[in-house]
Structures are given as structure tokens and as C-alpha cells.
Amino acid sequence: MALSLERKGEIIKTYQIHENDTGSPEVQIAILTERINYLNEHLKINSKDHHSRRGLLKMVGQRRSLLDYLKKKDFERYRSIVTRLGLRR
């Protein structure tokens, strides 16, 4: 199941840089993290769902790319988003 519009809106409001910001790396990383967490819970119950596992790995790779970009571009924003989301880096 995809993120509900309400939940996605909450995430965007929490992590946006300015009022109309929906595509900054911080927002994208936060949305991907929410989707990754949902899929992790799904896969704990449905361990044989290999199609979803592949999608999860793709999302993790996308988030990793966005984090690497942000780390290169602005290290302070990178540290901030990692801390706020509770990622292990």
C-alpha cells in the first residue's frame, strides 16, 4: 500500500525548506524512509514476497544516492536529516 495523501502531506510539512518545497533532498529522503519502514514491516509478516523485497532494495539505493548527494552538497543539512530521521550513519 502506498503512503496516504495525509501522511505524505505531514512528512512534506515537517521536512520542507520553504513553503512550496516538495522536491528537496530532505523531503525525498523522508518520504523514502517512511516507505522503507512500511515495507520492512510488511516483509516481516510476508517473508516470501520477493517482488516487494526487490522494490525495498531499490528504494534503499535511491535513498542512499540522495544522502550521498546531500552529503557532498551541504554536509550540515545531511547531518540534520540523518539525525532527525534516526538513520544509522
From Swiss-Prot:
Pfam families: Ribosomal_S15. The keyword Ribosomal protein applies. Keywords: Ribonucleoprotein, Ribosomal protein, RNA-binding, rRNA-binding. It comes from the Bacteria. GO terms for cellular component: cytosolic small ribosomal subunit. One of its GO terms (molecular function) is structural constituent of ribosome. GO terms for biological process: translation. The keyword Ribonucleoprotein applies. SMART domains: Ribosomal_S15. Belongs to the universal ribosomal protein uS15 family. Part of the 30S ribosomal subunit. Forms a bridge to the 50S subunit in the 70S ribosome, contacting the 23S rRNA. One of the primary rRNA binding proteins, it binds directly to 16S rRNA where it helps nucleate assembly of the platform of the 30S subunit by binding and bridging several RNA helices of the 16S rRNA. Forms an intersubunit bridge (bridge B4) with the 23S rRNA of the 50S subunit in the ribosome. This is Small ribosomal subunit protein uS15. The gene is rpsO.
